[in-house]
Amino acid sequence: MDTEGFGELLQQAEQLAAETEGISELPHVERNLQEIQQAGERLRSRTLTRTSQETADVKASVLLGSRGLDISHISQRLESLSAATTFEPLEPVKDTDIQGFLKNEKDNALLSAIEESRKRTFGMAEEYHRESMLVEWEQVKQRILHTLLASGEDALDFTQESEPSYIGDVNPPGRSSLDSIEMAYARQIYIYNEKIVSGHLQPNLVDLCASVAELDDKSISDMWAMVKQMTDVVLTPATDALKSRSSVEVRMDFVKQALGYLEQSYKNYTLVTVFGNLHQAQLGGVPGTYQLVRSFLNIKLPAPSPGLQDGEVEGHPVWALIYYCMRCGDLLAASQVVSRAQHQLGEFKTWFQEYMNSKDRRLSPATENKLRLHYRRALRNNTDPYKRAVYCIIGRCDITDNQSEVADKTEDYLWLKLNQVCFDDDGTSSPQDRLTLSQFQKQLLEDYGESHFTVNQQPFLYFQVLFLTAQFEAAIAFLFRMERLRCHAVHVALVLFELKLLLKSSGQSAQLLSHEPGDPPCMRRLNFVRLLMLYTRKFESTDPREALQYFYFLRDEKDSQGENMFLRCVSELVIESREFDMILGKLENDGSRKPGVIDKFTSDTKPIINKVASVAENKGLFEEAAKLYDLAKNADKVLELMNKLLSPVVPQISAPQSNKERLKNMALSIAERYRAQGISANKFVDSTFYLLLDLITFFDEYHSGHIDRAFDIIDRLKLVPLNQESVEERVAAFRNFSDEIRHNLSEVLLATMNILFTQFKRLKGTSPSSATRPQRVIEDRDSQLRSQARALITFAGMIPYRTSGDTNARLVQMEVLMN
């Protein structure tokens, strides 16, 4: 049969080929094997495409049919569904068709309400999402900013600092992260805060911090001496630090204090030099600055220098003696030299006497102009550098000349320029004779900058330059960038902050050092909050007590949301360190609170504890938050969080040291204490809490196999119906239960049905009847169990809560097995 079929097919093919060859108009097409294969693949793919849908339908039918689903019936139902009645436009009606008009109006009202509700819901969702993202981004932004020590150009400064390695100083886990200097500073801060909190007079924080410098090197001692000198000014009454710092009187005081520090430092330097070279110095005569300078010049100018003018006094150049007496800050000694050489100095004696007797070391405008004219005509190119320097200081002229022959060190240059700074503008001074403090500050900070002062080798020099020119914030920010000097920078900032001399950034998202619109050109602001938080981050996890002392300085500061920074920092500190009991206190068994470290700083600890609890709650630390709210006597929040914690563990099997066991013990302790002390919370929350505890007891009995006791508990709770008459009542009552109860409904129903089924099997397993248990009693009990099971099934179907399909299936299965 097959051979005949193939033979017939072959005959037809040969006949077709012969007919094709007989048509001469058609060209012959010849294909190689590859082309034939490609054509075959194309034909095959077309065939597969046509049959793939049919194959998919067959596979779907096989898969779903094995589960008892008829796919053809489902397809017919889906095709029969139409959205026309929902989404098609309403049909126009005649004006006289009242029924149609009313129907259209009703449909329009429904559609409008649905659309309005949809728009409102989507709008609220968008708004909540936007607010959530803004809050989250603000938190991320703060974390990013706090990880950056500096910003702008400083953030890209990768210059390697030449400092010793501190690898050997790394503390083991559990030890303090503070080194000896930082710990010494922390002790002084503790002493300071103790005095403040106790209501004593505010101690001098500069002196407390300066005492730490005795443990360190001379540079630190000099730094604190300078800080003490510069902060010893009388502030003018003002609403904020900017207005006070910008006042002419305060700025003049800063210059005066800086000059005093530089002069005293130089005098100390001359003393050290002279006593180190007593043989060459030949110190003698009446003790005083004059004799000290004479001895110093024996060392500095042992031989006559060419170009010095106007003779000598006791073997030393006149102008050199005058200059160095002024450099040591002793104008009386300089006046003594002027008096001895008055015949060689012309009018200078008169000018110097006026300069010395003036309140602010300033000549009258007429005398100043006269001296400047004399300087320009006769002294600008004078060969005596000391004479030029003295004239430039007294007349405050020729500010472009740095007098490098005399002022060869940075301190000398600072002293010279600060002497030339003027504050009043009488209009008579030419630009080359007028130097303002702002100009000098800009020159040092921006024109010269860090690169000019080789800050890596001499960091304290640049700090001194900025600090002595009243650029406190820039000086602190610079020193803070160096790890080994950071603690000193922070405590200088604390001193200025307490003295109300520090210019703080208006926002905490600002850079560590910033310039805000409206501020004078050379005024910088320091992000004090960020500075302090960056410093404490190093040790807040290992030394939370010390960190708390530093956070107390932020008690009057607010963040961008108006939140108290002390509260915020304390809450973050507690969450990070987990030292709840030590910082916030501990709840004793009798319900009293054992004070914590925070009690030293405030008498009302509830706001702080509530704040920490709120932060813990927002971070999802519900158990810790519940304990903290309990500490703050906030019963509503305690039970609300306990309900959230207990709900997921209610149906679990209890085991020693398990999550459920710990939470159950915690809840029982709270319940016993609240009942003993008569503490009550919101009625709804309170009833939910005690119902959850009863359900835990129910499941514990159920899992232990004590089904009769478990049944008695569920019967008393009236949570599920155990007869047909109470189904409606239980369904109505179910609407009043909280979500924490509803989430456990499936497990409660299954456990109750299991109890009924177990009792049913036990009943069936007993002997048919006995004297004590007649057949009728067994039948009545059998009927009762079936009725109770049917009530549970009815209840599960009527409640407005979506139980899982598996739960319903198991309930029905057990109910069927009982019938």
Swiss-Prot record:
Where is the protein found, in the record's own terms? Nucleus membrane; Nucleus, Nuclear pore complex; Nucleus envelope
Instruction: Tell me where in this chain the PTM Phosphothreonine is found.
Output: 49
Q: Which InterPro entries match?
A: Nucleoporin_int_Nup93/Nic96
Q: Does the keyword Amino-acid biosynthesis apply?
A: no
GO CC annotation: centrosome; nuclear envelope; nuclear membrane; nuclear periphery; nuclear pore
User: Which coarse location class applies to the principal site listed for this UniProt protein?
Assistant: nucleus
- Which keywords, in A-to-Z order, does the entry hold? Membrane, mRNA transport, Nuclear pore complex, Nucleus, Phosphoprotein, Protein transport, Translocation, Transport
Membrane topology, as annotated, equals: Peripheral membrane protein
What's an example GO BP annotation here? Answer: nuclear pore complex assembly
An example Gene Ontology molecular-function term: structural constituent of nuclear pore
Residues modified as Phosphoserine: 52, 66, 72, 75, 80, 430, 767
Function, as annotated, reads:
Plays a role in the nuclear pore complex (NPC) assembly and/or maintenance. May anchor nucleoporins, but not NUP153 and TPR, to the NPC. During renal development, regulates podocyte migration and proliferation through SMAD4 signaling.
Family label? Belongs to the nucleoporin interacting component (NIC) family.
Share what the entry says about its subunit structure, partners included: Part of the nuclear pore complex (NPC). Component of the p62 complex, a complex composed of NUP62 and NUP54. Forms a complex with NUP35, NUP155, NUP205 and lamin B; the interaction with NUP35 is direct. Does not interact with TPR. Interacts with SMAD4 and IPO7; translocates SMAD4 to the nucleus through the NPC upon BMP7 stimulation resulting in activation of SMAD4 signaling.
This chain belongs to the protein called: Nuclear pore complex protein Nup93
> Gene name?
Nup93
